[in-house]
Amino acid sequence: MRNLLRGMLVVICCMAGIVMADEKNILVTSGSDRATPIAVVPFGFQGGAVLPDDMAEIIGNDLRNSGYYSPIPKQNMISQPSQPSEIIFRDWKAVGAQYMMVGSIVPAGGRLQVQWALFNVATEQKVADGSVSGTTEQLRDMAHYISDQSFEKLTGIKGAFSTRLLYVTAERFSEKNTRYTLQRSDYDGARAVTLLQSREPILSPRFAPDGKRIAYVSFEQKRPRIFMQNIDTGRREQITNFEGLNGAPAWSPDGNRLAFVLSKDGNPDIYVMNLGSRQITRVTAGPGINTEPYWGKDGSTIYFTSDRGGKPQIYKTSAGGGGAERVTFVGNYNANPKLSADEKTLVMIHRQDGFTNFKVAAQDLQRGSVKILTDSTLDESPTVAPNGTMVIYATRQQGRGVLMLVSINGRVRLPLPTAQGEVREPSWSPYLN
């Protein structure tokens, strides 16, 4: 299992991951078709100060990151209207834009009032408009909100740009001195804040479905234990402290149960805890390593990684235990399952053959076909946006652990800005509004 024993130290010591992936014989990577051109014109600002954030740039980046839209570069814009009445549609037809957005920002009573409108260039008809207000510090929030509204109006898919991201950084100062930091940021890596620091590893952070709590593995006191923490207050409590492995926490869709991996009875297996009663049920049993649980949407099914067949593959089973059904058959390594919002696509770490080249891939669960989404070779820990349009994953670039974003259609692939040190273990929040 990409050496499942590395996996176990990545289940014990990296319990977010027995994961990583490679190419495949279907090798479909990025960009076989074009994203829709859209122009997000710089918003007009009727104020004296310089704003700390460029709302139009943030909105354009959001729409680009989805893989659905390709923003027109600012330097290609023939005109820059800020009001609908100022739009000259032939200018936007000339640069190939199919949609265009204008907006204005007006100071009002110590706050900023933002008006925006989105147009179909070909028909010259308004598609959507709205207003939002907030403080200067909330400019990014307002921009992500406008992105969400616009994306849903254009595609019928709820926008996921106002969501958050968890990840872990590791800064090594000397052989025996490493600082691990659990961070929360905007989905695009901006505005990172520290939730926890430790001299021991922090692994597998996961948002609860309410977005207010997280679970993670901490190696405080030199052994893995699972903790639950309130994001706002910082208050936390220990959930497991069994002998051996305690790792890979995964919240049920209703937030009332937590699946995780324990080795207290021998082999690493998946268990489920009722968080109300703290009663634990064993879900898997038998030979091999069973790890990386991930819940189906209805809370009755758990997907997981197992080497019971000799090499790591993805299986599914009832959350109450019982027989398991194999899900993946393409490639000699498939691990770390995540589902798209509609549960039609399985995102995973995939390897076709050999011992290297671990890539993020997406399997169509109806057809069984697998599409490679990345071109790197040491990918791990994929996490999927709540609307299923984007994947963030950890990989290595120039000898450093970094986070990357790829659209599920493969059109966009880009690095996320993060802090210094090794960055790993990303986890996407649910919708927060």
Curated annotation (Swiss-Prot):
It holds the Pfam family TolB_N. Residues 1-21 form the signal peptide. InterPro entries: 6-blade_b-propeller_TolB-like, PD40, Tol-Pal_TolB, TolB_N. It is found in: Periplasm. One of its GO terms (cellular component) is periplasmic space. One of its GO terms (biological process) is cell division. It comes from the Bacteria. Keywords: Cell cycle, Cell division, Periplasm, Signal. Belongs to the TolB family. This is Tol-Pal system protein TolB. Part of the Tol-Pal system, which plays a role in outer membrane invagination during cell division and is important for maintaining outer membrane integrity. The Tol-Pal system is composed of five core proteins: the inner membrane proteins TolA, TolQ and TolR, the periplasmic protein TolB and the outer membrane protein Pal. They form a network linking the inner and outer membranes and the peptidoglycan layer.
